[in-house]
């Protein structure tokens, strides 16, 4: 046997050893089965999933609205309170990636492709058909202002707060408490290690894998449709099935090469290029379009978003039956929740060494501001053009696939900006595909941070094959059915996320209670504070001392020396640490007091 053959054999053995059969096999079977059903019975599957989605929207849409707002409150609480001082790693650990590289990767994976796909189409849609419950006439200036506020609302704090819940919890459990990087471990502080390692944990990871792969595959399919429609609109190609297959194959091959090279190489490199191209495209439109109008609109859109947020965030419109809320807000909240395992886990993977406050500030606030700027540049440009020229609609409707290219075609050097737009779409899809493949691979390997390359290739290729088969054989109906199925996974996963918020709160409070802080005090101060039964003094040495917040009933003050005897709070994780090369072990932060 040659060295190459032995190497290939070893790679296969390593891949088989790395997978977790209780997760890998059921997830693969469910994915393949649903693809087959969606292709063979495309119309039946589409109707069935549409009815399922209607039932979810009508029956539990209020739940999506409630929990999405709750996640915003949870994220802000963690960022503003003392919880924000906790580091996602050892107390002295530095971030793994630079701030800008980190921001580029999380933004590209999070919703970059959606910004390109809906940057023009969504504001136009709200302008053309605003929600009846708001009472704003269509095609008016008031409708334009409301359209931008609604668009930023759908892509702002609520979307990223959903990602924060999963990403923050997984980063904390992995880099601070030594758990595998897997969704199931979010529940350990509540359900215990035994259930997490059992059937419940397997089911959570399978749901996460299925939702992630279907979400990425359907996005790839719809994205290819947008690229093809745009190129055909510009008169550059005549689209047929071979063009579709070729584009999917090229994107899948690039994504596979990137995911094999790892996060610190391919993914980081592509994300940086992607953000540079996206920034160049936005700058082109800003400078070549109505610049002053767009800058004024951006400030107004931010103000409109802040002003309308209290009205939008808990609005269920029970007296309105136009279906707008289900088609837009509830759809988006379900879509973001279904993507939360993928995006949240990927953000966790690249956030080692950040503090919780830094994590939330960057993940929650920065993308919201960037999204508002992006939608202002493209959305307000389209609204102004439609208001003045009336040429952004096709037969009185918004064409999502060609609306971006229609806008660019009306600007100077439209051909150049259109080429740039195609490149941005392609790179956004590549970064979404390779990060999605990496996340799925980590989940199927039981949380191993660096799974074998062979399994990474398996998931990346499966995403591309799923998109190609669904698009070419089943058509748009199959893609819609599978996207609806992905959104349906949001209902059970939203319950997992609510439990995770409670579990993480318990773990964070223990961490604060068990981690020492340093203050400079004198002996008289300590004795006096001890006599007054203050909460924050735990030693009697003059100089720098270790202190922590404790409840008044958990310590005893010696009447003569002021020394404290403190009872340690119970650890919701039972202080179990995994000693493994694959996972990050938490440094023991407790000390004698």
Curated annotation (Swiss-Prot):
Main subcellular localisation: membrane
Coiled coil stretches, renumbered: none
Localization, UniProt: Cell membrane
Transmembrane segments: 21-41, 60-80, 97-117, 148-168, 204-224, 243-263, 275-295, 328-348, 359-379, 410-430, 457-477, 485-505
Membrane topology summary: Multi-pass membrane protein
Keywords from the UniProt entry: Cell membrane, Membrane, Transmembrane, Transmembrane helix, Transport
One Gene Ontology molecular-function label: transmembrane transporter activity
Cellular-component GO terms for this entry: extracellular region; plasma membrane
Domain of life of the source: Bacteria
Entry-linked Pfam families: BCCT (PF02028)
Entry similarity comment: Belongs to the BCCT transporter (TC 2.A.15) family.
NCBIfam families in UniProt: bcct (TIGR00842)
Protein name: Uncharacterized transporter Rv0917
């Amino acid at each position: 046997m040659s060295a190459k053959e032995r190497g290939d054999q070893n790679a296969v053995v390593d891949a088989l050893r790395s997978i977790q059969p209780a997760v890998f096999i059921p997830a693969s079977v469910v994915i393949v089965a649903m693809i087959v059903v969606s292709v063979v019975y495309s119309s039946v599957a589409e109707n069935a999933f549409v009815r399922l989605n209607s039932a979810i929207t009508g029956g539990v849409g209020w739940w999506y609205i409630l929990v999405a707002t709750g996640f915003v409150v949870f994220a802000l609480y963690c960022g503003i309170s003392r919880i924000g001082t906790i580091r996602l790693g050892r107390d002295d650990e530095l971030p793994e990636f630079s701030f800008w590289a980190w921001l580029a990767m999380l933004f590209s994976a999070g919703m970059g492709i959606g910004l390109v796909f809906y940057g023009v189409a969504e504001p136009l849609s709200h302008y053309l058909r605003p929600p009846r419950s708001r009472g704003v006439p269509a095609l008016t200036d008031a409708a334009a202002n409301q359209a931008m506020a609604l668009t930023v609302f759908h892509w702002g704090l609520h979307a990223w707060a959903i990602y924060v819940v999963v990403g923050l919890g997984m980063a904390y459990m992995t880099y601070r408490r030594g758990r595998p990087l897997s969704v199931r471990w979010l529940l350990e502080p509540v359900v215990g290690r035994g259930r997490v390692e059992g059937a419940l944990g397997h089911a959570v990871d399978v749901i996460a894998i299925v939702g992630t792969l279907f979400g990425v595959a359907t996005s790839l399919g719809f994205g290819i449709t947008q690229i093809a429609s745009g190129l055909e609109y510009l008169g550059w190609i005549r689209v047929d099935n071979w063009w579709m297959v070729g584009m999917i194959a090229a994107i899948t091959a690039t994504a596979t090469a990137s995911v094999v090279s790892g996060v610190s190489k391919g993914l980081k490199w592509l994300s940086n290029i992607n953000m540079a191209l996206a920034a160049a495209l936005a700058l082109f439109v800003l400078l070549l379009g109505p610049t002053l109008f767009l800058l004024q609109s951006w400030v107004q859109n931010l103000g409109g978003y802040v002003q309308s947020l209290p009205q939008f965030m808990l609005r269920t419109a029970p007296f309105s039956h136009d279906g707008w809320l289900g088609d837009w807000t509830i759809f988006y909240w379900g879509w973001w929740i279904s993507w939360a395992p993928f995006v949240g886990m990927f953000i966790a993977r690249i956030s080692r060494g950040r503090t919780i406050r830094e994590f939330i500030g960057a993940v929650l606030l920065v993308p919201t501001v960037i999204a508002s700027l992006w939608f202002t540049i493209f959305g307000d440009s389209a609204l102004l053009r439609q208001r003045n020229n009336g040429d952004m609609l096709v037969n009185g409707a918004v064409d999502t696939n060609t609306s971006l290219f229609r806008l660019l075609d009306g600007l100077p050097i439209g051909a150049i900006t259109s080429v740039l737009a195609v490149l941005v779409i392609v790179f956004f899809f590549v970064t979404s595909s390779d990060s999605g493949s990496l996340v799925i691979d980590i989940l199927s390997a039981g949380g191993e941070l660096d799974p074998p390359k062979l399994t990474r290739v398996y998931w990346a290729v499966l995403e591309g094959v799923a998109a190609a088969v669904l698009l070419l054989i089943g058509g748009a109906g199959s893609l819609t059915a599978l996207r609806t199925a992905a959104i349906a996974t949001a209902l059970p996963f939203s319950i997992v996320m609510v439990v995770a918020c409670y579990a993480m709160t318990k773990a964070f409070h223990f961490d604060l209670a068990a981690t020492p802080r340093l203050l400079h005090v004198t002996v008289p101060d300590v004795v006096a504070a001890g006599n007054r039964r203050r909460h924050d003094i735990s030693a009697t040495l003059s100089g720098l001392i270790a202190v922590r917040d404790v409840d008044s009933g958990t310590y005893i003050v010696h009447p003569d020396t002021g020394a404290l005897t403190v009872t340690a709070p119970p650890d919701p994780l039972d202080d179990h640490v995994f000693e493994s090369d694959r996972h990050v072990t938490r440094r023991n932060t407790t000390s004698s007091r």
